[in-house]
Amino acid sequence: HDSDYYLQPIFNCCLINIGDMLDNGTVINGKLIESPKSFQVACTVMTQIIASVASSQYGGQSVDIKHLGKYLRKSREKYTRNYLSKYGDKVDPETLESFVNDRLYDELKSGVQTIQYQINTLMTTNGQSPFVTLFLNIDENDEYVDEVAMIVEEILRQRYEGIKNEQGVYVTPAFPKLIYVLDEHNCLKGGKYDYITKMAVKCSSKRMYPDYISAKKMRENYEGQVFSCMGCRSFLSPWKDENGNYKWEGRFNQGVVSINLPQIGIISGQDEEKFWPLLEERLSLCFEALMCRHHALEGTLSNVSPIHWQYGAIARLGKNEPIDKLLH
């Protein structure tokens, strides 16, 4: 795949370590981007990161929306402080909460709209919109689960509505792709978040997305872990860091090679004795092609793509540091 990019020292697709980049800051075009103080700013920074990453790689990328939850709470806390400072005891708690909720929803709607419109209007250096997937996983163990649920619901609501084309007609945007995770609490069996799944189904019926992933099946197949594919459909294999912790975000796919199984079946003439040797031959070619990709990346310096290697999308290597330790 993507043989025209073979000579460029960059990989195919990845899971951006967006949580680290938002929490600890990043650098884009030589300018320091500090950790956001509000949801709206976090959404803007996230789209800037997506565009920068897409301009420096040829494959898709995925971001986990759960990392925006804490910033929605920051906004709630900010509005609560502001209203308390302004009105104090003049307003009863119920009215105060109503004020905060109204203002928070305005920011939630605006932030999600920023993500959707920025991704669909920004052009990368490749001359195309960023190929990006938003991973919508409502994890009950997340301390910001209520905020994440609000964000996911609004993303689905806006995707259902669509984006206006030049004639002013609402159409289905190509990106971002949406992946919605089904778990025990939202699988339409009386769970707390079933209402969001109903919105997802309604959205899929009109806009084709979201796609769905079963958390139960993923845990069975991936050692109890639930995570997004990279861009469109490539899943990482489980891997633990030096501390024994599973790592998904901040990892990538060095290259992609496909096998045309129907072609092998046709060539073998439905003869199993011919089919298996042919398959072994093709698998050997696949391995050779993948190792060519691997060796082409060896020796690459972090300066080739600072947003990936130096400023958090994949790692935080030093300037001019080889990326080799991330390849093995």
Language model region names:
Residues 1-327:
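Conserved catalytic cores of very large enzyme subunits
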